[in-house]
């Protein structure tokens, strides 16, 4: 009858040994540094390579011949998921492995160190003080004299008869744990933002109402965050120009409306001043000329859509028919919303400049420019992980501050007319040594004063 290898002591020993090696490897600081470096390189790659673009974009900007750096082409970018680095499985795997390494380090190193700092014992033999980095003995020293000196220096005291233990700065042991916890919260927020967030772009003319539909990039769990029961109305879009004609700032007056058209919120946004509503953030990112409003002779106002022309700079144009059958017409060209357009004939010759509120005769028609209608370019982002990331960084900052607190310990024993004192600190050793020397000097002065008083 053969024994079960799973129940044999040798297998159990190998299993425990394997577990121990695994957790030791996972908690290794070198592994954490390597993972952090890999995450940093991946994040930098995601910053350099445009994210969430179309296949045509990558084929145009990263051709196979010649490939960037000799190897980086659109095929590599798509196959490695470099077009959506922050949602790629390998990147999320790096974050999870880094989080596991931090967790293992916390429970195998930092937490035991904190528990050890909370456990203390009295030194009841003079020989115990010899193993401390800083120790001394004073003849005729008294614990009663030592206590107030330590209390003045914010030590917490524990005393039993002729032995004393004091400590200060336990927060210094808590600091690394808070740093690790904060980093774990940051990682969790980053993962949640990648899986549950989305990014959209919209180009909306003034006066139009829209719902978020043009999703550029989205996580697999982001569907519930796309609003279905409210929309945004662009009340007005306008641009402020500097005296030299340069754009100073562009603005969008936005209203959030429900299904019944009732306004729920209204804000005017501009660059670096977005609208936040319902977990979404609307950024002012771009602009365009949506349409030209013109009048032909005494006709009603006609709104003709304008399109950006494939030319250098930002130029928009539209075709203005001068005959009912659309067989003839002129081109209206504009480069901004300052109310000026240039009219070109069918042969490409310029016919004149037209300003807002003015008219020009072209091909027997009186053409008036009523207005140029602008479109606001909005970037819409939803990142449910941002609050967690901010909270995590708060934990990290508090932990870093706590880590600078020195954890100092002092032991004392009064025996056979001698006062034995010793101590140690995990940091700021010079300051701790100076502090202990000052305490010893005060004790020595008090002992001498007591001796002189006794002689007198």
Curated annotation (Swiss-Prot):
<keyword id="KW-1133">Transmembrane helix</keyword>
<feature type="transmembrane region" description="Helical">
    <location>
        <begin position="174"/>
        <end position="194"/>
    </location>
</feature>
<dbReference type="GO" id="GO:0017004">
    <property type="term" value="P:cytochrome complex assembly"/>
</dbReference>
<comment type="subunit">
    <text>May interact with CcsA.</text>
</comment>
<feature type="transmembrane region" description="Helical">
    <location>
        <begin position="88"/>
        <end position="108"/>
    </location>
</feature>
<dbReference type="Pfam" id="PF05140">
    <property type="entry name" value="ResB"/>
</dbReference>
<dbReference type="InterPro" id="IPR007816">
    <property type="entry name" value="ResB-like_domain"/>
</dbReference>
<dbReference type="InterPro" id="IPR023494">
    <property type="entry name" value="Cyt_c_bgen_Ccs1/CcsB/ResB"/>
</dbReference>
<dbReference type="GO" id="GO:0031676">
    <property type="term" value="C:plasma membrane-derived thylakoid membrane"/>
</dbReference>
<keyword id="KW-0201">Cytochrome c-type biogenesis</keyword>
<keyword id="KW-0793">Thylakoid</keyword>
<feature type="transmembrane region" description="Helical">
    <location>
        <begin position="29"/>
        <end position="49"/>
    </location>
</feature>
<protein>
    <recommendedName>
        <fullName>Cytochrome c biogenesis protein CcsB</fullName>
    </recommendedName>
</protein>
<comment type="function">
    <text>Required during biogenesis of c-type cytochromes (cytochrome c6 and cytochrome f) at the step of heme attachment.</text>
</comment>
<comment type="similarity">
    <text>Belongs to the Ccs1/CcsB family.</text>
</comment>
<keyword id="KW-0812">Transmembrane</keyword>
<keyword id="KW-0472">Membrane</keyword>
